[in-house]
A protein has these predicted regions:
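Conserved C-terminal alpha-helix-loop-beta "cap" of PLP-dependent enzymes
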Residues: 103-168
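Conserved PLP-enzyme active-site core in the AAT-like
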Residues: 1-89, 93, 102, 106-110
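General structural feature for long, well-ordered alpha-helical segments within catalytic domains
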Residues: 13, 21, 50, 54, ...
C-alpha cells in the first residue's frame, strides 16, 4: 500500500498522487485544500476498500463514512475548496519571489526559485537565530492581519526545538 500525506501539495503539480500510483492520500483542510478559511477537517481519498478502512477508524465503528462533518462545517469546507486553487497559486508566487529575493541577498534557499515544486513549502536557511527571529517579526509586522503581534520562539508540542511562526 502506498499512502501519501498530501498536506501542502494539493493543486501544485499537474497530477495528484492518486493519478500516478498512490493507493490512498490524506490531507488537512486547514492547509491548501481548505483555501485558508476551513478552520478544521481532513480528507481521505483513494481505493474504496482503503477509504472504508480509514473511515471506520476516524468515525464511529460500524458507521464509517456514513457520518461526517456537522454543525455547519460543510459550508466552510466547500468555500475553502472553491478558493483553494487561487490561494495555492498565490502561495506559489510568493514562495518563488521569496526564494529569488532571499537567494540574491545571500541566503541559502530550498527549493531554488526556478526549481519545479511539489508543494508550497519554501525553506530559508538563516544560520543565525537572531536574523531568523527578526525576519519572522518583519513578516508579521507587514501583514494585513495581526500586524501588532510579536512572534517569539517557544516550545510547541511535537517539536524538539523552539518554534516561531509568522502569518497574516
Amino acid at each position: 500500500i502506498v499512502m501519501i500525506d498530501n498536506c501542502y501539495c494539493e493543486f501544485v503539480a499537474t497530477q495528484e498522487p492518486l493519478e500516478v500510483g498512490a493507493d490512498i492520500i490524506v490531507g488537512s483542510l486547514i492547509k491548501n485544500l481548505g483555501g485558508g478559511i476551513a478552520s478544521n477537517g481532513a480528507y481521505v481519498a483513494g481505493k474504496k476498500e482503503l477509504v472504508e478502512l480509514v473511515a471506520e477508524r476516524l468515525t464511529s465503528p460500524g458507521q464509517g463514512k456514513e457520518v461526517g462533518p456537522s454543525g455547519g462545517a460543510n459550508k466552510m469546507f466547500l468555500q475553502g475548496i472553491y478558493m483553494a486553487p487561487n490561494a495555492v497559486a498565490s502561495s506559489l508566487k510568493v514562495a518563488v519571489l521569496t526564494s529569488l529575493a532571499m537567494e540574491k541577498l545571500g541566503f541559502n534557499v530550498s527549493p531554488k526559485w526556478n526549481s519545479e515544486r511539489a508543494d508550497i513549502v519554501q525553506t530559508l536557511i538563516f544560520n543565525d537565530r537572531d536574523k531568523m527571529i527578526k525576519y519572522c517579526q518583519g513578516i508579521q509586522q507587514g501583514s494585513a492581519i495581526d500586524s501588532f503581534a510579536l512572534p517569539i520562539p517557544t516550545d510547541m508540542p511535537g517539536y524538539d526545538d523552539e518554534i516561531i511562526m509568522a502569518s497574516g
